[in-house]
């Protein structure tokens, strides 16, 4: 009997620079994504995503980073089935073509550099930033929001990489195949539903502590 990993285990994996698998609801996309922190967008991690994920490698990030880098929406009217919030695609100016695993890693890591400026990135490019909703998976149950929520909870920069996972036959992997992949490569595997539950518990606990520490004069 397979048991999903805990969110705590996922956070530890991300902090250690490892990739994890995150799956959404079977009534939504019913897909799994490989996810890693932007800090750990290494050549090895990007190459693994390209080789074994096979989907589009994107870079979910919070609103503040999108605004800092002046990344406008890819389109004015978003008609995507799940309203995935693509911005213009980018390459860092230090790259050549921008498409290699090495150079996509450079672009991702440069995005979270505290000194990053909009003019440091060419447009269009081969890295696809996605803007997460402000309230994360409570507002939208997508891999974009899950990525940013997980980075926040892990104490990492609010940006990561995600890549949809396809099977050998070109179809999207579903849960049974994702379980096999997680076992084969020893990857932590969690669900967005569990992430929502974890956030509810953490935020309710934080609120209870805050209320307990309030003096009568604060009420």
Swiss-Prot record:
Its cofactor is Mg(2+); Mn(2+). The keyword Ribosomal protein does not apply. Pfam families: DHBP_synthase. Mg(2+) 2 binds at residues 29, 143. Its EC number is 4.1.99.12. One of its GO terms (cellular component) is cytosol. Keywords: Lyase, Magnesium, Manganese, Metal-binding, Riboflavin biosynthesis. Binds 2 divalent metal cations per subunit. Magnesium or manganese. One of its GO terms (molecular function) is manganese ion binding. D-ribulose 5-phosphate binds at residues 28-29, 33, 140-144, 164. It is an enzyme of class 4 (lyase). One of its GO terms (biological process) is riboflavin biosynthetic process. The record marks 126, 164 as: Essential for catalytic activity. InterPro entries: DHBP_synth_RibB-like_a/b_dom (IPR017945), DHBP_synthase_RibB (IPR000422). Mg(2+) 1 binds at residue 29. Pathway: Cofactor biosynthesis; riboflavin biosynthesis; 2-hydroxy-3-oxobutyl phosphate from D-ribulose 5-phosphate: step 1/1. It catalyses: D-ribulose 5-phosphate = (2S)-2-hydroxy-3-oxobutyl phosphate + formate + H(+). The keyword ATP-binding does not apply. Homodimer. Catalyzes the conversion of D-ribulose 5-phosphate to formate and 3,4-dihydroxy-2-butanone 4-phosphate. Belongs to the DHBP synthase family. This is 3,4-dihydroxy-2-butanone 4-phosphate synthase. It comes from Methanocorpusculum labreanum (strain ATCC 43576 / DSM 4855 / Z).
